[in-house]
Amino acid sequence: MRRSFIVILMLVMTVFLAAPAASAQFIKIPKIPKPKPQPTPTETTQPAPASDSEPGQPQPAPRSTSTGAAPRSGGPYAAKPEPPATPQFLPDTLEIQVEHWDYYWKIPNDNHNTSWAPRIRFDVFYGGSSKLRYKADYFMPDGSLWYSEALEYRGGFDEKSGISLVQSESDSNRDKKAVVTGGVFGIKITNIRDNSTVFQGKFKVVRYKPTISDARYKNEVDYYVDYDWKLPIGFADLYFERDYATPIIRMWFKGDIKGDNLEARLFHNGQQIATTDDGGSVNSGERYYADKRGNDESLFWNEFKFSWPNRVEFIVTEDLRNFTAYKNTLFLNQMPGDYVVKVYYNGEQVRETRFSIGSNGTYADNGIARQNNLTTNKIILPVRVMGTLDKWNAVNAKAMGFYGNPVNGLTP
């Protein structure tokens, strides 16, 4: 009995002394959490949603933690030109069209005549604040003055591009200036503020009898401006965004050409690097045609614009490299060399032109604009017209030049 009591007493004392030590140990040693596994970034990681302020803009991709070679970086970068304080007339945007009336003001009682007068419009690259003032003088085929008109500055200033629109005035008496003959007419455009001649040239107006007109009335005709001379002339252009600029090649075609049947392939130093059939774009630009042409496709001129967005671009800022959508993009302004554009219609080659990129990160100046005194903000390209797609007269087109001004360096 006494022995049992001693054993029990010893057990109680052991428990009493051990409890404070155990309590102190639990307070001093915190519970260590298990580490959570982190996902490994992959190339399929999706960018964050675009914000409302910049819809459709790609978002920066996560920086790669790979120990491989670092991505390319640095310039040269494409720089968007600033609009000049002195207006720059852009001759490639000059459009001369005919406005016609189903009567002739000199024979008021004859309703079977068709008369016409010119209307023009053009763009000016300009960043100044003063209102633009221009006038146009028109000359008859014999060189005598036909009439003059003040041109309207429409206030259509595009803040993004620095482009302003100037065009013929809205004149209810324009029909009193109309004529009933075709031929080669002269035009002179003057900047009224300094009395400088910004452009002088000629345009050919063709008078023809439409097939849909009444054969009994020989003077029920139509008129159009002959634009065959545009076919051997192309332009290398750039469309600027914040981080990149898309190169655009502009060309003219004659006939009712379907854009879906066109394909433009881009070659660099002899190797194809892009095609509009794979992520590229073929867009219709300006269109000129005879109003009463009916089904005559030969009286239709259409500008097409070829580009390869996301495939080839001009890099403007280093930020562009952070966007997943551009990780495989070729930056042309960092790839000096020679480029060739070949255009196909239903698989048959119909156009070819070439341009170069200089070491300064922009189109190399081929000198055509400068030596022909054409103050465009684009690069003029000689275009080789191939095949039988276009029903045009190459000899007459070369003779006509650029609105009557011979252009050196072109290949008709």
Residue ranges of model-derived segments:
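A glycine-anchored, Pro-Gly-centered beta-turn/N-cap motif
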Residues: 179-188, 335-338, 342-347
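Conserved aromatic beta-strand anchor motif in extracellular beta-sandwich/beta-rich domains
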Residues: 136-140, 189, 264-268, 343
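Short beta-strand elements
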Residues: 194-223, 348-387, 403-408
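Solvent-exposed serine/threonine-rich low-complexity stretches and specific carbohydrate-binding patches
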Residues: 142-163, 274-309, 355
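N-terminal propeptides/low-complexity segments immediately following signal peptides
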Residues: 24-70
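Aromatic sugar-binding surface patches on proteins
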Residues: 116, 155-174, 294-327
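Contiguous beta-strand segments within globular domains
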Residues: 91-133, 222-268, 376-412
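N-terminal export/membrane-targeting signals
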Residues: 1-24
